[in-house]
Amino acid sequence: MARYLGPKLKLSRREGTDLFLKSGVRAIDTKCKLEQAPGQHGARKPRLSDYGVQLREKQKVRRIYGVLERQFRNYYKEATRLKGNTGENLLTLLEGRLDNVVYRMGFGATRAEARQMVSHKAIMVNGRVVNIASYQVSPNDVVSVREKSKKQSRIKAALELAEQREKPTWLEVDAAKMEGVFKRIPERTDLSADINEHLIVELYSK
C-alpha cells in the first residue's frame, strides 16, 4: 500500500505537534521547532478559515495514524455506518488498526516502526501471522511478537521506551512474553484530548 515518504519533521512543524513520535525516540527540539511553521525562519502561519481549521485537523489525525486520504475517507464512511457518535467511531477504528495496537502495546517505538514490523511478518494475532497494517483488531484478540523476532534489539528498546508512557487501560500487556490482549474498544475519554474529531465530521459533512 502507498504511504507518505516525504520529510516528516516538516509535517510536524506544519501541524505544530509531534505527528510521528520522533521526540520520544530522540531529541528533536534543536533540529525541528514544532511551534514554528516549515521554512528556514519559520514562516508566519496564515490565519485559517473555518474550512482551513477543519482541513488541518483532518490532516493532523490522518498523519498521526499514517493513513492516506482515500483510506481515511473510507474509515469515515465506515464510522457513519456504525451506531453512536461518528467522530468517536472514527477514532476507535483508527485505534483498532493492527499497527497502532502494536505501537500502543509497546512493541514498536513509533507507529511507523510498528507498521514495518507488521509488514515484515513479525506480528501474530491469535497465533497466526498477520502482515496487514490496517487489520482491525477485535476485543479479546491476542497480539504477539513472533518467536524468531523477539531477539530484535529495537523491540526491547521500544518496550523500555513504552515504560515512560501512560499504559492504555484497554490493553493488557505481558512485556516479558511480548504479547498483549486487546481487552476492549477504547472509549473517547481513553484517547488524546489534543484531537478534535468534531472538526473532521464537520469537514466531511459539507
Swiss-Prot record:
* Matching CDD domains: S4
One Gene Ontology CC term in the entry = small ribosomal subunit
Query: Locate the S4 RNA-binding domain: which residues?
Result: 96-156
Query: Known NCBIfam families for this protein?
Result: PRK05327.1, rpsD_bact
Q: How does it assemble?
A: Part of the 30S ribosomal subunit. Contacts protein S5. The interaction surface between S4 and S5 is involved in control of translational fidelity.
Q: What does this protein do?
A: One of the primary rRNA binding proteins, it binds directly to 16S rRNA where it nucleates assembly of the body of the 30S subunit. With S5 and S12 plays an important role in translational accuracy.
Protein name, entry field: Small ribosomal subunit protein uS4
What is the name of the gene encoding this protein?
rpsD
